Amino acid sequence: MARINIPVFLTILWISTCHLTRAKHLSHVSSLRSTISFKDCQNFKKKDLMKRNMKSQYESTSWGWNTKSKEKEMFEQSAWYLIVRESVSNLPVAFSHFRFDIDFHYEVLYVYEIQVEEDYRGKSIGKFIMETLERLCIQSKMEKIILTVFKQNQGARRFFREVMEFKLDESSPADTSEEHFDYEILSKKYG
């Protein structure tokens, strides 16, 4: 495992208390969450980081960018957050928005977002986040970890395929002569 070049520690935010009642394998994971309130979570401004990092990517696809829709998605009851903070200032430098879900009959940890502040890129924080999510996936007895990546985002595709060893998921849509998809679905299976 690569070492992170800056001192950081991890906080997992849990947005909703009703989520554990719906996920049979997750009762032992609740000890990982902090007591940070929903208000503190909103004050983190992760939506601003996500907008800075991803707005232009979305705008160049058929999906387009919709701020209200993205904010709604990020604050749904099923949302979990892994937040990396600098240990000296306690300021957030990266986050991942993820969910425990059922996807085509598989119990999965679905990574919705992984965002790193520009000044902290290239310091193995993304790899640290993904390795942490993989361990959480295994500990929670999920069958796979899954994510969606834009095809135009070559850096992200290279990171997930080459560094993290994700494969094209069987649910990923294939381009045809009539239809082109702006994204692909990648996954890594466990168990």
What are these regions (language model features)?
Residues M1-K45:
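Conserved N-terminal entry element of GNAT/NAT acetyltransferase domains
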Residues M130, Q152-A156, P173-E179:
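Short glycine/proline-centered loop/turn elements that form peptide/ligand docking sites
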Residues I114-G122, F150-K151:
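A short, internal acetyl-CoA/4′-phosphopantetheine-binding micro-motif in the GNAT/acyltransferase core
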